[in-house]
Amino acid sequence: MTVKRMDNVGIVVEDIDAAIEFFTELGLDLEGRAPVEGDWADGVTGLRDMRVEIAMMRTPDGHGRLELSRFLTPPAVADHRNAPVNALGYLRVMFAVDDIDETLERLFKRGAQLVGEVVQYKRRVSALLHPRA
């Protein structure tokens, strides 16, 4: 078996509209929105009577996608938003941008916060945005 590509990364959100606005402001495109439910969805996730609203966001180059999910039933359970960066599990998604300062300025207006600081690393500027953003 050969992996063809990474299809998407899933993020569970409380407010799907706010998440769409945030990632649109970052530069991703909304590919589509849809409800997800039924026996097939229950089977894939292992959750009974699952109902989720999803939005698929695509990077401008078309090579990466984020699946934003808002659980209607069962409700979302664990809250990892304040977990430290060394906690187990999914904690970050990184994007390459043309202008880090301009991008951060736009995202700060949407409530984003830096976890640390903007630093220079191998001729690339990197920053961590707080996951509550």
Question: In which residue ranges do the predicted regions lie?
Answer:
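N-terminal beta-strand motif that seeds the catalytic metal site of vicinal oxygen chelate
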Residues: 1-20, 29-32, 89-97
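Vicinal oxygen chelate
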Residues: 2, 11, 33-35, 56, ...
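C-terminal "cap" of GNAT-fold acetyltransferases
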Residues: 2-6, 36-66
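Conserved active-site tyrosine of GNAT-family acetyltransferases
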Residues: 19-25, 57, 107
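A generic structural signal for short beta-strands and their flanking turns/coil linkers
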Residues: 26, 53, 64, 89-91
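A short, acidic/glycine-rich surface segment
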Residues: 38-43, 75-81, 125
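Short, low-complexity disordered segments enriched in Ser/Pro/Gly and basic
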Residues: 49-50, 85-87
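Acetyl-CoA-dependent GNAT
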Residues: 70-74
